[in-house]
């Protein structure tokens, strides 16, 4: 297993906020190199890559709010492992302090160092669950007062941490509640004739548990439900799930967590409610039409079109648009962004029309030719509440160790189109 040699938290200006060395002293050159690399990318107004290379070591870095988390390593390390460690560090700090910004880190450096020391022991990941860490590391004084006012206990036995490391034993609520939110993230590519060329749906079961004690829950799905490429939270009883694929038995963490993630082929699911027609026309003209064929309104709809040359004019029937010039070339290319706050299912088709300027005869000429570039594709993004693309359905949620108690509050579904592309005719 790869080891974590050091952890650095720096702000957007490169100032060091926190430093933890888990395997002895690291060279001061490491921190200086991190600062120099980040400053170099900042001068170019570019976001640095996840991995920064040096002849003696690698630096893994990621920006969260206004704090950059950096982990250097001198040996071969799996990037996904480091990324998972980073996400868990961010989740823990957010759980304790409500955010991961520079001001919160500066005010709570001592507690964060204690948390990191418990999470990383001599370079190895040990206790990474926020609920378990709350039993080990004392909460800040403000949080202690808040928990006292709300009636939550701060002194708990360590037995629960040993048996169920992902759940704190001090969970106590006046009313027991359990919420489920299924997020379906769609990635798809459509051909010019409107037919699907490729598509996948990645679904996450986001849960929020507010149940006192140590509940044992049984989530029953619609009979015959099969979850493809599924990844469960460590609390799930896999033995029972293998015997009964439509039942999920688990002891939930306290608060928010992802119970399961699974992926399905979009071709076997329902079609998207938003239909897009994109056409190249004569003399540099192009047209985009959007229709809502579903029964619910689509929110925060956004169309992104890559424009390969100068843009003369744009007209839209609804919404706003903006043209963003490319940061990486001196040409007149860029991204045309069309935003619509809400597209009701009763609305007529929305239309965007535009005109491209003629191409230059050559790179050094100011004269225009009679030829035009053709647009290749556009990207669609939107959010649709209360709808689902597959037949996934929760039938019931029972508390096995307390059958008389009811905590289930229902399921909410959201479709998020984040990587959906339509090719122009």
Curated annotation (Swiss-Prot):
<keyword id="KW-0472">Membrane</keyword>
<dbReference type="InterPro" id="IPR036168">
    <property type="entry name" value="AP2_Mu_C_sf"/>
</dbReference>
<dbReference type="GO" id="GO:0031410">
    <property type="term" value="C:cytoplasmic vesicle"/>
</dbReference>
<protein>
    <recommendedName>
        <fullName>AP-3 complex subunit mu</fullName>
    </recommendedName>
</protein>
<keyword id="KW-0968">Cytoplasmic vesicle</keyword>
<dbReference type="GO" id="GO:0030659">
    <property type="term" value="C:cytoplasmic vesicle membrane"/>
</dbReference>
<dbReference type="GO" id="GO:0072686">
    <property type="term" value="C:mitotic spindle"/>
</dbReference>
<dbReference type="InterPro" id="IPR011012">
    <property type="entry name" value="Longin-like_dom_sf"/>
</dbReference>
<dbReference type="InterPro" id="IPR001392">
    <property type="entry name" value="Clathrin_mu"/>
</dbReference>
<keyword id="KW-0333">Golgi apparatus</keyword>
<keyword id="KW-0813">Transport</keyword>
<feature type="domain" description="MHD">
    <location>
        <begin position="175"/>
        <end position="423"/>
    </location>
</feature>
<dbReference type="GO" id="GO:0006897">
    <property type="term" value="P:endocytosis"/>
</dbReference>
<comment type="similarity">
    <text>Belongs to the adaptor complexes medium subunit family.</text>
</comment>
<keyword id="KW-0963">Cytoplasm</keyword>
<dbReference type="GO" id="GO:0044732">
    <property type="term" value="C:mitotic spindle pole body"/>
</dbReference>
<dbReference type="InterPro" id="IPR050431">
    <property type="entry name" value="Adaptor_comp_med_subunit"/>
</dbReference>
<dbReference type="GO" id="GO:0030123">
    <property type="term" value="C:AP-3 adaptor complex"/>
</dbReference>
<dbReference type="InterPro" id="IPR028565">
    <property type="entry name" value="MHD"/>
</dbReference>
<dbReference type="Pfam" id="PF00928">
    <property type="entry name" value="Adap_comp_sub"/>
</dbReference>
<dbReference type="GO" id="GO:0006886">
    <property type="term" value="P:intracellular protein transport"/>
</dbReference>
<keyword id="KW-0206">Cytoskeleton</keyword>
<dbReference type="GO" id="GO:0032153">
    <property type="term" value="C:cell division site"/>
</dbReference>
<dbReference type="GO" id="GO:0030131">
    <property type="term" value="C:clathrin adaptor complex"/>
</dbReference>
<dbReference type="GO" id="GO:0006896">
    <property type="term" value="P:Golgi to vacuole transport"/>
</dbReference>
<dbReference type="GO" id="GO:0030276">
    <property type="term" value="F:clathrin binding"/>
</dbReference>
<keyword id="KW-0653">Protein transport</keyword>
<dbReference type="GO" id="GO:0005794">
    <property type="term" value="C:Golgi apparatus"/>
</dbReference>
<dbReference type="GO" id="GO:0051286">
    <property type="term" value="C:cell tip"/>
</dbReference>
<comment type="function">
    <text>Part of the AP-3 complex, an adaptor-related complex which is not clathrin-associated. The complex is associated with the Golgi region as well as more peripheral structures. It facilitates the budding of vesicles from the Golgi membrane and may be directly involved in trafficking to the vacuole.</text>
</comment>
């Amino acid at each position: 297993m790869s080891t974590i040699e050091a952890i650095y938290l720096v702000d957007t200006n490169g100032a060091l906020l926190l430093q933890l060395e888990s395997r002895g002293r690291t060279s001061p050159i490491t921190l200086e190199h991190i600062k120099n690399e980040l400053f170099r990318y900042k001068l170019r107004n570019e976001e640095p890559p996840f991995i920064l290379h040096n002849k003696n070591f690698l630096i893994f870095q990621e920006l969260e709010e206004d704090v950059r988390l950096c982990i250097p390593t001198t040996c071969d390390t799996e990037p996904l492992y480091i990324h998972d460690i980073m996400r868990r560090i961010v989740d823990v700090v957010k759980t304790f302090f409500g955010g991961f910004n520079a001001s919160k880190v500066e005010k709570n450096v001592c507690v964060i160092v204690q948390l990191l020391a418990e999470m990383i022991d001599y370079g190895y990941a040990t206790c990474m669950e926020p609920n378990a860490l709350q039993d080990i590391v004392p909460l800040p004084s403000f949080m202690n007062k808040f928990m006292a006012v709300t009636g939550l206990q701060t002194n708990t036995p360590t037995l629960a941490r040993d048996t169920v490391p992902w759940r704190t034993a001090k969970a106590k609520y006046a009313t027991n509640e359990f919420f489920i939110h299924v997020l379906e993230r769609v990635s798809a590519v459509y051909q010019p004739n409107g037919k699907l060329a490729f598509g996948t749906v990645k679904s996450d079961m986001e849960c929020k548990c507010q149940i006192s004690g140590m509940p044992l829950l049984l989530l029953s799905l619609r009979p015959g439900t099969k979850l493809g490429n599924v990844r469960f939270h460590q609390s799930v009883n896999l033995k029972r799930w293998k015997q009964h694929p439509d039942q999920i038995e688990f002891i939930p963490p306290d608060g928010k967590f992802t119970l399961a993630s699974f992926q399905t082929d979009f071709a076997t699911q329902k079609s998207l409610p938003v239909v897009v027609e994109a056409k190249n026309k004569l003399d540099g003209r192009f047209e985009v039409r959007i229709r809502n064929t579903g029964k619910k309104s689509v929110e925060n709809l956004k169309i992104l079109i890559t424009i390969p040359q100068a843009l003369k004019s744009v007209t839209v029937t609804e919404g706003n648009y903006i043209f963003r010039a490319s940061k990486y070339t001196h040409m007149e290319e860029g991204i045309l962004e069309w935003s619509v706050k809400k597209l009701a299912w009763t609305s007529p088709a929305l239309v965007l029309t535009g005109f491209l300027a003629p191409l230059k005869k050559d790179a050094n000429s100011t004269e225009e030719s009679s030829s035009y570039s053709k647009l290749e594709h556009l990207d669609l993004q939107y959010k649709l509440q209360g709808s689902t693309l597959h037949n996934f359905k929760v039938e019931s949620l029972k508390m096995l160790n307390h059958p008389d108690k009811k905590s289930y509050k229902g399921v909410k579904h959201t479709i998020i189109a984040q990587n959906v592309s339509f090719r122009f005719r």
